[in-house]
């Protein structure tokens, strides 16, 4: 009985351990980590800098049943400012419906004789991508584990500002898994 309790405790502990510590040097120097998106704002916050990295070895296809796809990967967000230098590690799970890719929507609009304005309006509201971000860890730039106080979130991924970062990350995951951009897939 006691052995069973220890085994269950070990299994529970294994699933609550945060992701492996990582430093900014490792993100910058290892070919395993690909820069997805980079932001240096203009104006009053020009001293801030954020870079998102994809751990290319973490990419896992969870669902492949055309037109539906689901991909999981680890994404690191390195944020640097005069006040703080921190790396956030998140597990991303993105669901894709290629019937709503831009190419699919344009194809169907052409078949129906719809106007370009109609296609643009539909494409802005129906992206075909939904993402879940689950925090794995938070680290200083030298790799020290920091406390995390964020819950997982699931939301639609849109093509327009201000959420282009999430869109670019989701498109990069699709590209890394299938060597084509999500928007280029046509479902007739």
PLM region descriptions:
Residues 21-90, 97-188:
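N-terminal secretory-pathway/extracellular module detecting exported/lumenal segments
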Residues 8-16:
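Bacterial N-terminal signal peptides
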């Amino acid at each position: 009985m006691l052995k069973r309790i220890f085994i269950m405790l070990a299994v529970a502990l294994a699933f609550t351990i945060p992701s492996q510590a990582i430093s900014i040097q490792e993100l910058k120097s290892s070919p395993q980590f690909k820069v997805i998106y980079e932001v240096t704002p203009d104006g009053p916050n020009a001293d801030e800098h954020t870079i998102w990295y994809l751990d290319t070895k973490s990419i896992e296809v969870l669902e492949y049943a055309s037109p539906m796809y689901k991909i999981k990967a680890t994404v690191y967000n390195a944020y640097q400012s005069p006040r703080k230098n921190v790396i956030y590690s998140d597990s991303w799970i993105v669901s894709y419906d290629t019937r709503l890719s831009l190419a699919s929507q344009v194809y169907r609009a052409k078949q129906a004789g719809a106007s370009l304005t109609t296609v643009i309006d539909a494409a802005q509201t129906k992206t075909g991508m939904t993402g879940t971000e689950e925090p794995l860890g938070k680290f200083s730039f030298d790799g020290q584990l920091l406390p995390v106080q964020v819950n997982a979130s699931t939301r639609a991924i849109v093509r327009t500002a201000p959420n282009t970062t999430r869109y670019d990350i989701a498109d990069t995951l699709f590209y890394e898994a299938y060597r084509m951009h999500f928007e280029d897939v046509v479902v007739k």
